[in-house]
Amino acid sequence: IRDSFLTYWTVFMSTLLNLEPTMLIAAIFAVLHVIFTLRVGGYRFSNNISLGDGGDKELLNRIRGHGNFIEQVPIALVLLLLNDLNGLSDMAMYTLGGVLLVSRIVHYLMITTRSLPMVLRPLSMIGTLGTILVSAFLLVF
């Protein structure tokens, strides 16, 4: 009985802790967070602005790009983790994570550089909020 319990427990724990999709997605977003933070901090340092935006439009855009990222990504990552723990397929996890990643990068670029077609900004929010809503829906149904 002891050996069968240990075998069952080992299989259960290895399945439960098989969170590669979430770990990869979270790691990518962690790197983006550091990059976006350094873009704000570096600009502050080079322009001697320690608090607020100092009336600098470029700094304001960088602050809001980073802030919007921080406002949206944590809840999405929590929902993705819960779906991963709930057994959502790796393909579905990578699809949701990929949509979120592309959406967040495009949205950040739209806020900070405005170098992409304006139609992409609302589309990037649709991708972000869609990922959040689909992830929530999958947890309930």
Regions found by a protein language model. Give the residues of each.
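Physicochemical signature of membrane-embedded alpha-helices that form the seven-helix bundle of GPCRs
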Residues: I25, I63-H66, L96-V99, S124-G127
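Cytosolic, membrane-interface loops and tails of multi-pass inner-membrane proteins
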Residues: L38-R64
